[in-house]
């Protein structure tokens, strides 16, 4: 934060998710977590949270991103101030993909552990069910992707502020 605004920072913190992903057992484990800051905006303190949920997943298992989203929701449940969460959720509203659905990105696929069309294995839907609002335009419309070539070619979404104020 800019030095002239440092007095607006009320508190900061971070946490590590309990769920990790081990690529090479005992040698390489991927740890993820989140950082937060309570910042005075006008007369209201607002908690800003940034995170990067796990992208890797194992077939017929609940993706770590969903487990991490559950922990994030639980960790924030007693926060009294407004909350803004941002980051890379590595989740798509269509996950887990039903067999034969387009899945060019290798997203989680439906299985006994992860039924399609539910939030059981979907970090995005878990956050929505917990009451968080997606301030971007329709996440199912590929034109609104905020990653990949579309974002690189077209730049930031000019309508994001408008959607957040609705």
List the predicted regions and their residue ranges:
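Second-shell loop/turn segments in exported
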Residues: 24, 55-62
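Metal-dependent phosphoesterases centered on the DNase I-like endonuclease/exonuclease/phosphatase
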Residues: 60-166
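Structured beta-strand-rich core segments of catalytic domains in phosphoester-bond hydrolases
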Residues: 1-53
């Amino acid at each position: 934060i800019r030095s002239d605004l440092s007095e607006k920072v009320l508190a900061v913190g971070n946490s590590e998710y309990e769920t990790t992903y081990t690529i090479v057992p005992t040698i390489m484990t991927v740890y993820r977590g989140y950082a937060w800051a309570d910042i005075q905006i006008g007369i209201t303190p607002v908690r800003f949270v940034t995170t990067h949920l796990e992208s890797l997943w194992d077939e017929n298992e609940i993706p770590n991103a969903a487990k991490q989203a559950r922990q994030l929701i639980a960790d924030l449940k007693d926060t009294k101030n407004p909350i803004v969460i941002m980051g890379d959720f590595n989740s798509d509203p269509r996950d887990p993909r039903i067999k034969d659905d387009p899945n060019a990105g290798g997203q989680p696929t439906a299985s006994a552990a992860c039924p399609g069309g539910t939030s059981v294995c979907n970090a995005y839907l878990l956050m929505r069910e917990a009451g968080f609002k997606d301030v971007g335009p329709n996440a199912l419309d590929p034109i609104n992707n905020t990653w990949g070539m579309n974002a690189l070619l077209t730049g930031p979404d000019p309508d994001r502020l408008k959607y957040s104020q609705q």
